[in-house]
UniProtKB/Swiss-Prot annotation:
This is Cholinephosphotransferase 1. The modification N-acetylalanine is found at residue 2. The lineage of its organism: Eukaryota, Metazoa, Chordata, Craniata, Vertebrata. It comes from the Eukaryota. Gene3D superfamilies: 1.20.120.1760. The record marks 129 as: Increases basicity of active site His. InterPro entries: CDP-OH_P_trans, CDP-OH_PTrfase_TM_dom, CDP_ALCOHOL_P_TRANSF_CS, CHOPT. Mg(2+) 2 binds at residues 111, 132, 136.
Amino acid sequence: MAAGAGARPAPRWVKALGEPLSAAQLRRLEEHRYTAVGESLFEPPLQLYWTWLLQWIPLWMAPNTITLIGLAINLVTTLVLIFYCPTVTEEAPYWTYLLCALGLFIYQSLDAIDGKQARRTNSCSPLGELFDHGCDSLSTVFMAIGASIAVRLGTHPDWLFFCSFVGMFMFYCAHWQTYVSGVLRFGRVDVTEIQVALVIVFMLSTFGGATMWDYTIPILEIKLKIVPVLGVVGGLIFSCSNYFHVILHGGVGKNGSTIAGTSVLSPGLHIGLIIILAIMIYKKSATNMFEKHPCLYTLMFGCVFAKVAQKLVIAHMTKSELYLQDTVFIGPGLLFLDQYFNNFIDEYVVLWIAMVISSFDMMIYFTSLCLQISRHLHLNIFKTSCQQAPEQVYKHID
């Protein structure tokens, strides 16, 4: 027998790791066209700044490179803050807050011009859209942690939990309604306004110190740190009312279904499972795991969220069904089982194991996804080239 003649094909699960998308999904991805609707309050004046900034970006720099640089800066500056404030109750050196403000501002700026650079270099593609949203999903987690540290929200664990997960929920809902309607909608108060508000919070902590947020407001008898929290609550109500108005009024698919022809409520199972697991593990912890390690806890669930959000984005782009079964839930599942068996293993140890599993699972999926799409569309992820995929049609309807 000739060498290799009897070789068996790789198991299905091994192939899925390297090629998450099927041939049919890749064909539908080629047909995807990005469509955005609406304009936020700060967008018109900031367009002048973004246009000015774009002229300093060399034409050879790929849009995805710009996005990744911004994300890396945002992550590194937030990790410095986490190092000084692991329980979100400490006061960090003033320069760490300033560093976070600068990091978030740079991230926002680069995130805003990556699409402009893509159109400028005629390199718009589904890969760029996926890469941008994937980075945004991870940045959402770090922004929530950084802002919570800036106001020392760890002194109020329940509010800290709420603010740590509400950003994930709102980000998911924004893409949930996109999966239903086929259109990404920007509200009058959207991510740009939130980022500007967070930069202001970091600057206030820089010059006033994190302890300034412990000041009790006369008459109202609430601490100053609760004011931005109430702003988050108001933003949640305002944004989600718009998101669910779109979701519950039916999608563009057959009989009011999603763009993939599935139930408009089906994506809610994924974010619902994440939040339910997070709440159950938080409240049932015998060692007060969330109170002692809020940053690690949020980052672990943040990795789970980031992968699920990426799957929702690619499901929209490929008009595919979103399946609940996923290896990324292994991490939270280990924590749940450990509690079920009366903490057979130290919760802190299991939390670290869950963090490693969830982060690697998320990174492997996102890397495999980008590599598969780049091969199929004959694109270089971090370089502009003469041979590009067919340009997307960008529609921005006011």
